[in-house]
A protein has these predicted regions:
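N-terminal pre-catalytic segment of deacetylase/amide-hydrolase enzymes
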Residues: 1-16
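Structural motif
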Residues: 14, 40, 81, 134-135
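A short, charged/proline- and glycine-enriched loop
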Residues: 16-22
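Active-site neighborhood of phospho(di)ester-bond hydrolases with catalytic His/Asp-centered motifs
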Residues: 24-27, 48-53, 90-95, 126-129, ...
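Short, glycine/acidic-enriched loop or turn micro-motifs at the edges of active sites
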Residues: 29-30, 56, 132, 149
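Core catalytic region of metal-dependent phosphoesterases/phosphodiesterases
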Residues: 30-115
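Conserved beta-sheet core of the metallophosphoesterase superfamily
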Residues: 116, 120-188, 194-195
Length: 198
C-alpha cells in the first residue's frame, strides 16, 4: 500500500530488528530525498553506504550546465546523511558525480573515487558504482548501482546487492538483507522523465 502511494514500506520485522544496520542506496534522484530521510529516522542505521550518482535526475556528464542544480542536490543529500546518527558514511562516486562538489559538502563522510573494500563488524564489503568491479575478486558482500546488468543475488556464497533495484538494509549480526522497493516514479525521475513534488 505505501509503495503505490509513493512511500517506502518498512516492515514490522525490519523496524523491530534490534541489530546494528547498514543502509545501502544508489542512484538517488532528488524526489527520493524526503523518503530517504524518513527511512534513516525510522531505522537509525549505524552505517550508510551510497554507491554513486547522488543526484541521479541530473546527468551531469551529459548536461554540465546543470552543475548549480546538481550542487544544490548534493548539499541537500549530504545534509540528510550527515545529520543522521550513523557512525560511518561511505560514498563511492558515480559517472554523473563531480568529486570536487561532493568533497566540498562532506564533513564526516568517506568519499571514494573508485571501488573500495571496507570492513564493518565481521563483514567485508566491496563497494563501487559499477558491478564489473566485482567480477574478478568479489568480497563477502558486494554493493553497487549504475545499471541492472547484474541484479541482487547470491553467487557462490557471495552476496551482490544492486542499489538501483532496491534500497538494501543489512542486519550486521545475522547478515539478513532487507530489500525495500523504491517508490513509483523513482526510475522515471532517474531518467529525467518524471517531475512531481513529494
Amino acid at each position: 500500500m505505501f509503495y503505490s502511494l509513493g512511500s517506502i514500506y518498512l516492515s514490522k520485522n525490519l523496524l523491530d530488528n534490534p541489530e546494528p544496520k547498514i543502509l545501502h542506496i544508489s542512484d538517488t534522484p532528488t524526489v527520493l530525498y524526503s523518503q530517504l530521510k524518513r527511512i534513516i529516522t525510522k531505522i537509525q542505521p549505524e552505517y550508510i553506504i551510497h554507491t554513486g550518482d547522488l543526484v541521479d535526475n541530473i546527468k551531469l556528464s551529459i548536461y554540465p550546465s546543470r552543475i548549480d542544480e546538481y550542487s544544490n542536490g548534493v548539499d541537500e543529500l549530504i545534509e540528510i546523511l550527515e545529520s543522521s546518527s550513523a557512525k560511518e558514511i561511505h560514498i563511492t562516486l558515480g559517472n554523473h558525480d563531480n568529486k570536487n562538489i561532493v568533497r566540498n559538502f562532506t564533513n564526516r563522510s568517506t568519499v571514494y573515487e573508485k571501488n573500495a573494500v571496507i570492513n564493518i563488524g565481521n563483514i567485508s564489503l566491496k563497494i563501487s558504482h559499477y558491478s564489473n568491479d566485482f567480477i574478478i575478486s568479489p568480497s563477502n558482500f558486494n554493493l553497487f548501482g549504475h545499471d541492472i546488468s547484474l541484479g541482487s543475488q547470491v553467487i557462490n556464497g557471495k552476496v551482490f546487492l544492486n542499489g538501483i533495484q532496491n534500497i538494501n538494509i543489512i542486519a550486521l549480526n545475522s547478515k539478513k538483507v532487507f530489500s525495500l522497493p523504491y517508490p513509483i516514479g523513482t526510475n522515471e525521475s532517474r531518467l529525467g522523465k518524471f517531475k512531481i513534488g513529494m
